């Protein structure tokens, strides 16, 4: 193996081990402007997109001890390495896809040491993010509290109203 390929292989191995997960993509009709825009979107969620040769990527997977066989690895192969939350990276891919006529196809992925098919990665991307889930939980907890506060306010205003009416009657 040439020295350049060995260096690239080591670099990809390091990215695989350093990342929280990765997403294998096939890209279609991807221009340089699309690539730049996509990379900028991913940098916001601590992820990066790389175009890699299949042979190099699968060798790096093998030497990193990761077993993965994407259903269909035909075409150009792109990999999103997620150094932060891999679900957020998958969501970015999904959002980008909606804006650019499905130019990216999910082939496979690895999130939290679990290998996923392309369909599974896409399903995970459609789930609410941790931030959204936290907001929903806070909303569920806060809603009954606000109802209790509303009931207490109405009871107190009823008591105050009764006292006011009693005071008016005694003044007459």
Swiss-Prot record:
<dbReference type="InterPro" id="IPR047865">
    <property type="entry name" value="Ribosomal_uL10_bac_type"/>
</dbReference>
<dbReference type="InterPro" id="IPR043141">
    <property type="entry name" value="Ribosomal_uL10-like_sf"/>
</dbReference>
<keyword id="KW-0694">RNA-binding</keyword>
<dbReference type="InterPro" id="IPR002363">
    <property type="entry name" value="Ribosomal_uL10_CS_bac"/>
</dbReference>
<dbReference type="GO" id="GO:0003735">
    <property type="term" value="F:structural constituent of ribosome"/>
</dbReference>
<dbReference type="InterPro" id="IPR001790">
    <property type="entry name" value="Ribosomal_uL10"/>
</dbReference>
<keyword id="KW-0687">Ribonucleoprotein</keyword>
<dbReference type="Pfam" id="PF00466">
    <property type="entry name" value="Ribosomal_L10"/>
</dbReference>
<comment type="function">
    <text>Forms part of the ribosomal stalk, playing a central role in the interaction of the ribosome with GTP-bound translation factors.</text>
</comment>
<comment type="similarity">
    <text>Belongs to the universal ribosomal protein uL10 family.</text>
</comment>
<dbReference type="InterPro" id="IPR022973">
    <property type="entry name" value="Ribosomal_uL10_bac"/>
</dbReference>
<dbReference type="GO" id="GO:0070180">
    <property type="term" value="F:large ribosomal subunit rRNA binding"/>
</dbReference>
<dbReference type="GO" id="GO:0006412">
    <property type="term" value="P:translation"/>
</dbReference>
<keyword id="KW-0689">Ribosomal protein</keyword>
<protein>
    <recommendedName>
        <fullName>Large ribosomal subunit protein uL10</fullName>
    </recommendedName>
</protein>
<dbReference type="GO" id="GO:0015934">
    <property type="term" value="C:large ribosomal subunit"/>
</dbReference>
<comment type="subunit">
    <text>Part of the ribosomal stalk of the 50S ribosomal subunit. The N-terminus interacts with L11 and the large rRNA to form the base of the stalk. The C-terminus forms an elongated spine to which L12 dimers bind in a sequential fashion forming a multimeric L10(L12)X complex.</text>
</comment>
<keyword id="KW-0699">rRNA-binding</keyword>
